[in-house]
C-alpha cells in the first residue's frame, strides 16, 4: 500500500504515527512535531504526525476535549505547512469528514465506531487513506468484515479499495482494563490490509480513575517490542513532552524524551523479524 508517498507493509520497515493525544496549543504541536521529525528523519522512519482536534469519547463531561474543528485544523494545517509533515486525525461524525479530509492526509476512525456501517462507508468514500481502529469489544477476525465494508464503499465510488489499515488497540479485559493478544496482529492480516499496532491506547485503563482514564505507560515499550516481534506494518504511539501535564491520555503517553531510544530498539527488532519472512505462514493449521 502507498501511504503519504511511501510504501507500507510487512515487507517494509515499520512506519510511525505519533504525536500528542489532543491539540492543546499551537506551540506544543509545533515543538512536538518538530522533535519527532528530527528523530524519525535521523532513523529513516516514515512518519505521520497525529493529534485530535476533538476528543468526543471522554470519561467525564468536564474533561478537556480540544480546541474544536476550526481552530484544531488551523493548527494542524500550520504543522503540515511549516514542517512539511503528513497529518492524521480522527473523525467522530459524518458531518466532519469532508472538512477534515480537506486538511489532513490520513483519516482515523474511533474504535467504538468500527461497527457503524454508515460511518465506515462515509469515511471510506472520502478518498483518503483510513486507519480503522478495532473496537475493544471486537474479535480480531471480525475486522475482515469492517475492512470489507470500507472496500465495498470505496469501490462503489470508483475509489482506491486498498486505502485502508486495520489497527489493534487492545481488548476489554474485565472492568477498567485492556489486554493485548498478540495473535490478533497475525489474525488481522487476513483482512489483506496493513496492520498497525496502537502501543499507547493498548495500555490504557479506561475510566480507571473515576472521572478520567488511567494507564500504564511503563508497559508501552513492552507491548511495542512484542508487536514488532510479531510483525506489523506500522506503529501508533501518542507522546507528550510532559505526560503528567497532558490534557488527555497522559497516563499512557510516551515521554517525548524517550521516543528516540524506544524507536532505535524497535528498529532493530523490526529488521530481525522481517529478515526471513513469517514462519507462521508455512506452519498451517
Curated annotation (Swiss-Prot):
A Pfam family matched in the record? DAHP_synth_1
Matches recorded under InterPro entries: Aldolase_TIM, DAHP1/KDSA, KDO8P_synthase
Q: Which SUPFAM superfamilies match?
A: Aldolase
Q: Does the keyword Chloroplast apply?
A: no
One function term, GO molecular function aspect: 3-deoxy-8-phosphooctulonate synthase activity
Q: Which GO terms describe its biological process?
A: keto-3-deoxy-D-manno-octulosonic acid biosynthetic process
The record's catalysed reaction(s) read: D-arabinose 5-phosphate + phosphoenolpyruvate + H2O = 3-deoxy-alpha-D-manno-2-octulosonate-8-phosphate + phosphate
Localization terms from the record: Cytoplasm
Q: Which UniProt keywords apply?
A: Cytoplasm, Lipopolysaccharide biosynthesis, Transferase
UniProt pathway annotation: Carbohydrate biosynthesis; 3-deoxy-D-manno-octulosonate biosynthesis; 3-deoxy-D-manno-octulosonate from D-ribulose 5-phosphate: step 2/3; Bacterial outer membrane biogenesis; lipopolysaccharide biosynthesis
Does the record carry Transferase as a key word? yes
UniProt-listed Enzyme Commission number(s): 2.5.1.55
First-tier enzyme category under EC = transferase
Task: Report the GO terms under cellular component.
Answer: cytoplasm
What the entry lists under HAMAP family is as follows: KDO8P_synth (MF_00056)
Task: Indicate the family of this protein.
Answer: Belongs to the KdsA family.
Return the protein name. Answer: 2-dehydro-3-deoxyphosphooctonate aldolase
